[in-house]
């Protein structure tokens, strides 16, 4: 858990609100919304941060989580039985606020369709009206989203023709780094990559252990095809989608689908570089290793291969972003943290 990663902190608060732990009384005494209790913990953290005592700060955050959230979860597990007759309320991870949530979520869906989905063989997007109908959003939302894709460099609107799109392997336009939305989402891409780096080991192990044989055979087939066609650029995405689609935990699937969506924002930056990076040998080695381990049903081999390549690619991605002009402090932009639960219809 990285407390200096704003996206990780956003996820922490979102899951805490979803569980309702912020509003639970503990032993009839204090609760997590107790302002003096929260201020006391915050003061200790601030003091440790001022003195740059990072080890003790990490311990303070860990202890607070265990004393509060950990104890609350244990109490819930022992006193509340799940109801088999009621449908569970799914966890929804809201990274953005208000309209940007719809616009940026649609942008991620369109990027998926452009790179690996239904638009991957096309040169132009469907009309605004068709996209509006297909994705269930207003035409004005489609228009704002396409503008964002233009700024990102993944698309180019041409008067009288439509919106040109640039698929995998095609050089695309240079992202407009003057656009706040582009810079913000590239920061989220970086933060999502870091979340993946710290969590993929446990998630991949659990997913492989729980996945049906047919699901693992499908992943093996995808990776084999990538090697045969010489197109291994997407194999990390395929593993990410495997976890997002087949984890046994709904919450993990939700989180990893969001990580995948944020991942897509980073591709146009790489594809736009005039003297772009050479194909990274590690990704081909990773693909071949994973194929071997899947054939041998070697879960730990797959997990270690994924962990290694994600760490390597994360370091490379950070270098890309810094060389393209983003500042280190920008990569830590604070996403919205919803501290109040409001009526969704208001």
Regions inferred by a protein language model and the residue ranges of each:
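A ubiquitous short alpha-helical element
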Residues: 4, 24-34, 94-96, 183-189, ...
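C-terminal all-alpha effector/ligand-binding and dimerization domain
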Residues: 28-86, 269-346
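Short linear motifs at protein or domain termini
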Residues: 84-195, 346
